[in-house]
Amino acid sequence: MSNVERALISVSDKTGIVEFAQALADKGVELLSTGGTFKKLQEAGIAVREVSDYTGFPEMMAGRVKTLHPKVHGGILGRRGQDEQVMADNDISPIDLVVVNLYPFEATVANPDCSLEDAIENIDIGGPTMVRSAAKNNASVGIVTDAADYQRVLDDMAANNGALSDDLRFDLAIKAFEHTAAYDSAIANYFGKKVEGQDGMSNLDFPRTINLNFEKTQNMRYGENPHQKAAFYTERNPAPASIATAKQLQGKELSYNNIADTDAALECVKGFTKPACVIVKHANPCGVAVSLDGITTAYDLAFATDTESAFGGIIAFNRKLDAATAQAIVDRQFVEVIIAPSATEEALAITAAKKNVRVLVCGEMEGVAASGLDYKRVNGGLLVQDRDLGMITEGELKVVTKRAPTEAEMHDLIFAWKVAKFVKSNAIVYAKDRQTVGVGAGQMSRVNSARIAAIKAEHAGLQVKGSVMASDAFFPFRDGIDNAAKVGISCVIQPGGSIRDEEVIAAADEAGMAMVFTGMRHFRH
């Protein structure tokens, strides 16, 4: 290891850079810098040399060309113990440390008012070139792309008499390659959606190529099954109030299935504005309720839907977890995960008595869900679609039967429809007074899903008569409505769109049922 004698600093994000540069200068490191970074360090009274002075070549083209020079890249790429003579012949001094972060391309294009010209001017050229050069030559050169690593570098230099350890240089190089890969991916994704037409530049719905960039959050003991290896990765800028940003306060490490099921429960409960509880088992809601009396009552009602399936389930709330609700849960059932926007200290003291209960807080839920894309891996390919954010209001429903729903039925219809969206297809949901009465999930036959919902309700001792029924897709035959009438369903919400809609509507009219069409399907596979 050789000492760090010369460092080149050129950063867009100047967080902590003055302090870091001062610490390097105090260690006797010669500093080179460019543009705004040079000015900031100079104003702070730090001894620093401008790169243009070092190269003898001025910055030009409004800053587009600053560091693209052999004296810079030769100093970074020069192999110690091999290229010294070439460097000396060309008056190239070795650069031992490169500190660079890049123009804020992602933040720039995230602005809806960003023009193509703005995007182009925020494509960094010299920065990534220096980063890659330093990372390539990590055997001799340190590369820092993250302000969070400044102290690591200083501590390592202090521990190694002014040099950087091989391990740290290699780790920083990996991080640098990840940094430039993510940067180039963002650029490719942005331009990959652009298409030039008669009216100028417009966006494609989907880019020509997709470059995904996720960071590993944790390794897991195993995947969906014990023989599968697994890890959890998150987006670089995940949506707030999501499983990716949730903070675990208590309990053992989350499993692969815990994360998948908690995501399903959390996204479902976000759909309700009144106090709500969602209980999920194997990615399906097995009990959901809304109560103006608060989340304790909502939990009581959700649990009552299917007490057997709730065992070992995931419970999500859209309000702060309080002591009364926490006590009701631990007294009544075994639970894998509880997630809520926040939790009281009293609630946490209660759940802490059950050491295996995982408690997560996700922050306040602003809006229903973040937009974006959904991905499904298939052998040799990737299916990509918009996230299913579709939701209907009462005014958008089409009454297709002679009888219209009552006000109470309408509330229950919209409630049941929100739940059905998160039930695996074929999905049937029975609900009454904004409580699920029975849930039929994942059957190949819609009629069988309806039968299962009725069996679940009977087993739970809940009254189906007078309940509403939600179906995630249309009824292809009238038998689904005939069976619903037999168990006492009073009202139905479904997308409509079958070639036999008239027969289905006639069946509802014959039974005196009300039925509304949403015009929107919610398949979930």
From Swiss-Prot:
Pathway: Purine metabolism; IMP biosynthesis via de novo pathway; 5-formamido-1-(5-phospho-D-ribosyl)imidazole-4-carboxamide from 5-amino-1-(5-phospho-D-ribosyl)imidazole-4-carboxamide (10-formyl THF route): step 1/1; Purine metabolism; IMP biosynthesis via de novo pathway; IMP from 5-formamido-1-(5-phospho-D-ribosyl)imidazole-4-carboxamide: step 1/1
Positions of the MGS-like domain: 1-145
Entry keyword Hydrolase: yes
GO biological process: 'de novo' IMP biosynthetic process
GO cellular component, as recorded: cytosol
Source organism, top-level taxon: Bacteria
Keywords: Hydrolase, Multifunctional enzyme, Purine biosynthesis, Transferase
Domain statement: The IMP cyclohydrolase activity resides in the N-terminal region.
Molecular function terms from GO: IMP cyclohydrolase activity; phosphoribosylaminoimidazolecarboxamide formyltransferase activity
Protein species of origin: Alcanivorax borkumensis (strain ATCC 700651 / DSM 11573 / NCIMB 13689 / SK2)
Span of the signal peptide: none
EC number: 2.1.2.3, 3.5.4.10
Organism taxonomic ancestry: Bacteria, Pseudomonadati, Pseudomonadota, Gammaproteobacteria, Oceanospirillales
UniProt entry tagged with the keyword Oxidoreductase: no
Family note: Belongs to the PurH family.
Protein name stated in the entry: Bifunctional purine biosynthesis protein PurH
Reaction(s) the record says it catalyses: (6R)-10-formyltetrahydrofolate + 5-amino-1-(5-phospho-beta-D-ribosyl)imidazole-4-carboxamide = 5-formamido-1-(5-phospho-D-ribosyl)imidazole-4-carboxamide + (6S)-5,6,7,8-tetrahydrofolate; IMP + H2O = 5-formamido-1-(5-phospho-D-ribosyl)imidazole-4-carboxamide
Name of the gene encoding the protein in the UniProt record: purH
Gene3D superfamilies assigned: 3.40.140.20, Methylglyoxal synthase-like domain
